[in-house]
Amino acid sequence: MNIHEYQGKDILRKFGVSVPKGIVAFSPAEARQAAEQLFEEQESNVVVVKAQIHAGGRGKAGGVKLAQSPEEAYEIAGQILGATLVTHQTGPEGKEVRRLLVEEGMNIEKEFYVGITLDRATSNNVLMVSTEGGMEIEKVAEETPDKILKIQIDPLHGLLGFQARQAAFFLELDGERFKNGVKFITALYNAYVSIDASLAEINPLVVTAEGRVLALDAKINFDSNALYRHKDFLELRDTGEEDPFEVEASKSNLNYVRLDGNVGCMVNGAGLAMGTMDMIQLAGGKPANFLDVGGTASPETVTEGFKIIMSDKNVKAILVNIFGGIVRCDRVAAGVIEAAKKVGLNLPVIVRLEGTNAEAAQTMLDESGLNLISANGLRDAAEKINEALAG
C-alpha cells in the first residue's frame, strides 16, 4: 500500500526523523492559510507548494513551485489543484491533483539519496545511500553505480552503529552534519522496521547551510501482508490514486494488475499467469491484465474477475487458463458459465482447463450452450487467440 508524501512525513516525524514543517491543503484558500502560518513560524521568506500524487517526477511536471507570499501560494494552488500531472511514473494518462503540501522553504547546501528496502536476492533489508540526490536512483545505478553504497542489514542485529556511520562517511558529511546524518539514518531504519514498510525512500535528503539534515521528500510503501498489525494505516489509503479496476479486484481478494493490451487473461498462480502473458504476446496479442484468481477460486470470484476484465474497453478477447491443482476445474467452469449469463459475454472467450476434474469441467462447458472456445494446450490456445483477434 502506498501513501502520500505528507502522510509519510507525519509518520517519520513520530520516530525522530527530521522533516520540514508542512501543512496539507485541499483548496487554494487552505493553501493560503497554510502559507500564512508557515511564514509566521519560520525565518525563510519562501514556502514550497507541492502536488500530492502517488508518483515521482512531480517537479519536472510542474507540480512543485515556490511561493514568496500567501497570495502567491493561493494562485499556485489554483493552478495545480485539479490539474493532471504526467510524469515518467504516471503513464501518459497522468494523475489528477486533489491535495497539496505547503512546506517551509529550505536553504539547501547539498542533496543526497537514502533508501531502505528488501533485497530479495539476499533476504535482507538493504540500506542504500547515494551522493546523487534528487535523481532517479535507477538511472544512477545504471550510469554511475560507483555513486551508490549498499549496506546489507542482518535481520538478527538490525542496523548497527558502524553501518550508519559508514553511510554518513560515504556521503562525505563532517562535523555536526555527520552526527545529524547518522542520527537521521538510524531513525529512518527504526521507523522502517516498526511500521513494517517495504520501502522507505528519501530523495532528496538535504543538508542545509545551517547544518540540518532533513527529508525533503519521503516515499513510504507498506507490506500489505502486515497491515493487520497497523489497522490505523488503512485510513491513509487514497483509492483515488489507485487504478479503479485494481481497487475493485482487491474487494474480491483477486490479484489484478491492469496493463495496456487487448487480451484479458484469467489464470490461477502467478507463474502460470506470467507464462500465459508471454504466450499471448507470442501469439500476436498483448495482455490487458495480470489476474491471478488464486488457489481458492469459486464461481463468485471467477464472475467478479470477468466483470473486471469486461470493464476494460481495450479488451478484444479473453483467455481463461487454469491448471487444476488446489482449485478444481469444474468450479472454474461453473464460474465461467455463471459469468457468461450474468455479465453477457460478447467477446471471444478461449478456455483451457487442465488438472483436477478437467473432463467434468469440459463437459459442463460443452453442455452450457454458450459460445465458449475450448483449447487443448497452450499452443492451441495461442492459435485460437490469434484467430479471435484476426476475426
UniProtKB/Swiss-Prot annotation:
UniProt-annotated binding residues for Mg(2+): 203, 217
Keywords for this protein: ATP-binding, Ligase, Magnesium, Metal-binding, Nucleotide-binding, Tricarboxylic acid cycle
Pfam families: ATP-grasp_2, Ligase_CoA
InterPro entries with a match to the protein in the record: ATP-grasp, ATP-grasp_succ-CoA_synth-type, ATP_grasp_subdomain_1, Succ-CoA_synthase_bsu_CS, SUCC_ACL_C, Succ_CoA_ligase-like_bsu, Succinyl-CoA_synth-like
PROSITE patterns on file: ATP_GRASP, SUCCINYL_COA_LIG_3
Known role: Succinyl-CoA synthetase functions in the citric acid cycle (TCA), coupling the hydrolysis of succinyl-CoA to the synthesis of either ATP or GTP and thus represents the only step of substrate-level phosphorylation in the TCA. The beta subunit provides nucleotide specificity of the enzyme and binds the substrate succinate, while the binding sites for coenzyme A and phosphate are found in the alpha subunit.
Protein name: Succinate--CoA ligase [ADP-forming] subunit beta
Organism this protein belongs to: Chlorobium phaeobacteroides (strain BS1)
